[in-house]
Structure formats: structure tokens, C-alpha cells
Amino acid sequence: RSGSVVSPRSAPRRISCDAKDINLPVLLSAATFEFAFIAFDLQTDHRFSAVDTAIHDLVLASTSDQLREDVAAQVLSNLFPIGGFGALTLSTLFLLFGLTPSVKTRLGVAWGVYISSMAAVGVLKEAFARPRPSADILHSFAFPSGHTCAANVLTGLTLFVLLDPVWDAAKKLVGKNKAEYKSSQDELGRADVKTQDLQVAARPPILGMRISFWIFASCTTATGRIEGNRHWLSDTMGGAALGIIFVCLALMLIQQFEDAFVSDGID
């Protein structure tokens, strides 16, 4: 139909949080340096131990056993790792319908990065074999914090990798339903315009909001691990840095794929 306001084909939209929005090489370098610094300190004279011990003693002196166990260890520690895994899973299920090469790539990279990050945490824990602050936990080691890394990776993947395709799919679904409803009462042209207006008006959360929530998720989880007497401060710093590394690698990898899709004209 001539005069349609919806273009028949559009180039795949680049990932919203690429190197133009976040300086990924700088962020990756900073996170790598932080992790390497903490790891080196643990393997040498561990000068950061004074800070770790001071924070640990402060937590024990200012909180009760019940607060540490019921609130910090159970709620704060698990809120974002469990919530992030749920968000990643639900996003994947939602996107399974009408998969495009770009969406397939994002899903594959997201799950691959998450699994790889958890495998890396397991290997690093065994390699560093750092005792936990609580003498009651002897079955696993402390560095790096797996919960903090998981919260960082899962939240980052959901916000920066899958949120945009989920948002686009939801817009199309709502727009289609609205168009069908309008077309049953009005002429098709007006329904088409309404659908386009809806898709233009709807915008996903801005980058600043995503970054703020990403930081909040990591800090909340780290606080839970420290106050729950599960980890030293440096454990959570290492876990957060490791999570940032994996999220940055995921974004950079996806960007390379989507650049190739654009150049090849693949939707």
C-alpha cells in the first residue's frame, strides 16, 4: 500500500550500549586492573588485609547474628542473583518467538557469558583458596565473591544485552494488538498511524538509569555478602570487577556481530 508510514525493512538496530555510549575498552581495562591488583595483593603481602579486617570487625560489632543471617545472607545476598537469573530466563523465553539473527546472537552470548563467568569463579576460588571470614564455612573459598559476580553479570546482561530486544518485541506485540483493534473499528490507514505513533513514543530506559541500577545491584549484593559474614570486602570487589569484565566482553562481542549484520544487510 502506498503512503504507508511503516517502512518495509529497516537495518538491525545496533546495541544501545556500545563503545559510543560506554567507553568499553576503558571500563574493561579499569576492571581488569582492579581484579589484578586485588589478586596480586592476595598472593603477596596482602596489605589490604587491614581494611578487610576493619570492615569485618565493624560488621560483627554493629549487627546481630539474626540480622546477618536472615537479612544480609539470605535476602540481600540473593535478591539480585536470583532476580537476575529469573530476568534472563524470562527474557529468553519471551524472545524465543520471532527470533532474528541479531536476537539469536544476543541470547547465545548472554548465556555463554553467564556460564563462563560462573565457571571462572569456581576455578579462581580453588586457585586462590582464600578462607572465608566465617569459620563455620569450610566447604568453599572466599575469593572472588560468586554472588557479587553473578549479580553483576546477570543484571548487566539483562539491562544492556536483552532489554532492548525485549522492549522492541513488546512494542510490536502491543502495537499489533492495537492495530487489530483499531482496524476493526476504523480504516486501516488510521490504525497504521496509531501503531507507528505508539512505537515512536515508547522508549526503553535511558542509559544512565541502567548503569545506576547495575551499580545498585552489585553494591546491594556485596553489602549482603559482607554483612552476612560470607566474604571480605576485597572478595566482593574482585567479584564485581570480574563481573564487569565479562559484561564488557559480552557487549564488545555482540557489537562485532551486529556490525557484521549491518554490513551484510542481515536483519
List PLM regions with ranges.
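N-terminal chloroplast transit peptides
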Residues: R1-V6
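N-terminal transmembrane-helix/juxtamembrane module of multi-pass inner/ER membrane proteins
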Residues: P8-A87, K125-L138
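Short helix-capping/hinge motifs at transmembrane helix termini and TM-loop junctions
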Residues: T44, L99-P101, F128-A129, G228-N229
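Interfacial segments of alpha-helical transmembrane regions
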Residues: L93-S117
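Membrane-embedded catalytic cores of phosphoryl/pyrophosphoryl-handling enzymes
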Residues: A135-D267
